Amino acid sequence: MGVGDGRDQYELAAMSEQSGKKKSKNKKEKKEKDMDELKKEVDLDDHKLSLEELHHKYGTDLSKGLSNSRAEEILARDGPNALTPPPTTPEWVKFCKQMFGGFSMLLWTGAVLCFLAYGILAAMEDEPANDNLYLGVVLSAVVIITGCFSYYQDAKSSKIMDSFKNLVPQQALVVRDGEKKQINAEEVVIGDLVEVKGGDRIPADLRIISSHGCKVDNSSLTGESEPQTRSPDFSNDNPLETKNIAFFSTNCVEGTARGIVISTGDRTVMGRIATLASGLEVGRTPISIEIEHFIHIITGVAVFLGVSFLLLSLVLGYSWLEAVIFLIGIIVANVPEGLLATVTVCLTLTAKRMAKKNCLVKNLEAVETLGSTSTICSDKTGTLTQNRMTVAHMWFDNQIHEADTTENQSGTSFDRSSDTWASLARIAGLCNRAVFLAEQIDVPILKRDVAGDASESALLKCIELCCGSVKEMREKFTKVAEIPFNSTNKYQLSVHKIPSGGKESQHLLVMKGAPERILDRCATIMIQGKEQLLDDEIKESFQNAYLELGGLGERVLGFCHFYLPDEQFPEGFQFDADDVNFPTENLCFVGLMSMIDPPRAAVPDAVGKCRSAGIKVIMVTGDHPITAKAIAKGVGIISEGNETVEDIAARLNIPVNEVNPRDAKACVVHGGDLKDLSCEQLDDILKYHTEIVFARTSPQQKLIIVEGCQRTGAIVAVTGDGVNDSPALKKADIGVAMGIAGSDVSKQAADMILLDDNFASIVTGVEEGRLIFDNLKKSIAYTLTSNIPEITPFLFFIIANIPLPLGTVTILCIDLGTDMLPAISLAYEAAESDIMKRQPRNPKTDKLVNERLISIAYGQIGMIQALAGFFTYFVILAENGFLPPRLLGIRMNWDDKYINDLEDSYGQQWTYEQRKIVEFTCHTAFFTSIVIVQWADLIICKTRRNSVFQQGMKNKILIFGLFEETALAAFLSYCPGMDVALRMYPLKPNWWFCAFPYSLLIFIYDEIRKLILRRNPGGWMERETYY
């Protein structure tokens, strides 16, 4: 296999077999890379190859590297080692989406129709009325203002790739033609021989060929918090788990390594995640689907009414032009002009309220999505847990002791009086390379930053808390020799000089490491400060303790020591750590210490609240199944008494395959098994198990899990903080990133950021989301109701030929004036009592606007409001001499400018000017009547099920809204000059009271309806009227 085969081979390695067949022939094909391909597991085989095979595959000399000329050829062939930026949406397109999307389109249609109607009138008459022109201008202004507002609020942009750019290391050290040289990381090519050292970012995916104590931090990729050892050994079939592959853009924490580049740029594992995250089609938010559904209903009603009356007016003998003007009038009267602004303001208010509770919302519509969430897929590390390893248990003196893992050290403490504990603490402090960073004297011990790996940091903090300064301990026992931890012997050892006055020895050897390895090196054990022989009974006791702590998902370390005899190791003896010249066998075992990343304090309560709100919480983690299961039990994701298949098998003492999976409510799925599951099998797991943990998952699998949940009809929220979470965050209905620990990439992909990294904040978000949905329903019910008293005058004007009871300008004053603040005030309404006790809404059946809401608003309350308006209208005209029978069919003469002697019911003659003043006074009175009946409507819309008396009148904004709409109506009626500007005339005080009985009727009618609802849950009234 010669050098020339390289291209085919590494394509296969980086992209999996299928994509190897479909080589990217040109840029277009490269862009349309099959997303399903990216979702598959990384299919590398380079970690299985011997060094000889590697040399053949890549044509690289393992000591001299590639030649410069060969590297240039490969660079020309493959392009730079960089991530391809995704196509971004230009800002003007985003602006246009706000201007012409969804609800705005309805208003634009209304505006265009108004201009059209004005144009028709202008062509027909010399002095056309300006009403339609005003209406068109106002509608356009409403859309433009709210569009700009939304655009500024919604600054969610596709910066995902920008933050990936920050992950690209700037420089790389390569060996070419036998010489080491620093080059720009973008120039690294497949087959390059690269050297990395502690502190470097890895410039591409490498196959390690030699290493020296090398550890890498893979947390941004796999979610594992512990640094991972890297060596030339092939240790696992899974390329993400094996020790001989280091990944692009992860960090080398310590040691050095040399490796051959096996993939660059978009073909690296990180590149695949980047392409996956930026290429995912993001679904629409539930609220945008709801608003579209609502627009369809409103448009449907408007067009149906418009066309019906167009035909009716033609039958009644009106001309075509008049009929079209009527059609336009009816359609425009149906458009709730103020609703777009109301919805935007409601969402913004909630977003601000959530920001105060540590939830930063990037996308306004995401506010509501969280409320409809039915499944939360949560990352473990840092979200459910504190993201700091902490000593949880010790085993010494033949018993397990529990340490305090609470964040504020408020838990129980163990007995520290034993001499064995003193020895154990000394070993943990001395055989430990972690140190506190400088200048942190005032910082509490648990919050201090440490240089060193997670386990050693946990030991350092534990000993500092329990025994005082570790630094002083180390100064007292000076270190004279050390063997650092390595993966072959799995222990770390150091020799220390005992301060003068030591017992029979001047030197103490201390060792820690994998418990079984440490125990094998011991002949005695310390119990109550005294050494005794290690017999089978104690070994069994050790084994039980080790299994118990391991079963809790904890990382267990063993500790032993040995006093080196003076006759063999006198003062000044030269200890040699390379060619070991001191004993490492027959030591004295002291004890075990186990560490875990403990759950956050508020999480169990939050998980409980999710459960009572009908939300399923699934844990998805890159960590080990045992640890994941232990934390899941600790926080209540797996509740007490619920068993997995393995638990049932252990209890009944039968093989796992004999247990019926449906008997187990809980289940822990290993990423390795998930790979082999079909979509149907995954769907079954998600459907039939109520409590699920996915462990050892890869980024692609997180995405597959989210898609599985969505297939089963769930609305999914995903929390995460690593780069590995970004595809899932982007795909979820709502992605929630961590503000403190989260990587830039995850924050860009998410819709919401938890500023305090606390899972409990999500529950607050869910409550706020449900509340906004409820309150938007109430707001829409309130706004739509006044549509009926706005439309019916127009219909009677056409059918009964009466003078127009309500003009276009007055309709605008209601929709954009008096109704605005009350509708927005409903966003401040407190939650009804059952908000976190009910199941998540079903997006298919529980709509924002459903038939029942339309029936209540239009068919019931709206009709009573229309009666109130007509009652006032007929009262005023009757007082002026026109009794109802006289009004029928009078319209043609009434609107004729040249008739100045029209007789009323009593024979008085009216000029055109006088008639119009009475007509405009009627418009004003009809308008004030709507305001008065809207008082009752606003109060009944406060609740959907509870009585207003139960809910109370605590919403100050709503009370202010009631006064504001009344004051505005009075101002428009009585302010001098309004008769010219808006054709609104002052009213007699008694005309205000005509609508009061109707307002009272609305209130009583609705209170009785809600009483029946509460008395007969699920009954006819609920089925027909509960919206």
Swiss-Prot record:
Its EC number is 7.2.2.13. Residues 85-87 are annotated as: Interaction with phosphoinositide-3 kinase. The active site is at D379. It catalyses: K(+)(out) + Na(+)(in) + ATP + H2O = K(+)(in) + Na(+)(out) + ADP + phosphate + H(+). It is a multi-pass membrane protein. It is an enzyme of class 7 (translocase). The modification Phosphoserine is found at S16, S947. GO terms for biological process: intracellular potassium ion homeostasis; intracellular sodium ion homeostasis; potassium ion import across plasma membrane; proton transmembrane transport; sodium ion export across plasma membrane. Residues 112-134, 312-323, 797-806, 871-922, 975-989 are extracellular. It is found in: Cell membrane, Sarcolemma. The chain crosses the membrane at residues 91-111, 135-155, 292-311, 324-341, 777-796, 807-827, 848-870, 923-942, 956-974, 990-1010. ATP binds at K490. GO terms for cellular component: membrane; plasma membrane; sarcolemma. One of its GO terms (molecular function) is ATP binding. Residues 1-5 form a propeptide. SUPFAM superfamilies: Calcium ATPase, transduction domain A, Calcium ATPase, transmembrane domain M, HAD-like, Metal cation-transporting ATPase, ATP-binding domain N. Residues 1-39, 217-238 are annotated as: Disordered. Residues 1-10, 29-39 have a biased composition (Basic and acidic residues). InterPro entries: ATPase_P-typ_cation-transptr_C, ATPase_P-typ_cation-transptr_N, ATPase_P-typ_cyto_dom_N, ATPase_P-typ_P_site, ATPase_P-typ_TM_dom_sf, ATPase_P-typ_transduc_dom_A_sf, Cation_transp_ATPase_P-type, HAD-like_sf. SMART domains: Cation_ATPase_N. Mg(2+) binds at D721, D725. This is the catalytic component of the active enzyme, which catalyzes the hydrolysis of ATP coupled with the exchange of sodium and potassium ions across the plasma membrane. This action creates the electrochemical gradient of sodium and potassium ions, providing the energy for active transport of various nutrients. The sodium/potassium-transporting ATPase is composed of a catalytic alpha subunit, an auxiliary non-catalytic beta subunit and an additional regulatory subunit. Belongs to the cation transport ATPase (P-type) (TC 3.A.3) family. Type IIC subfamily. NCBIfam families: ATPase-IIC_X-K, ATPase_P-type. This is Sodium/potassium-transporting ATPase subunit alpha-1. It comes from Catostomus commersonii. The gene is atp1a1.
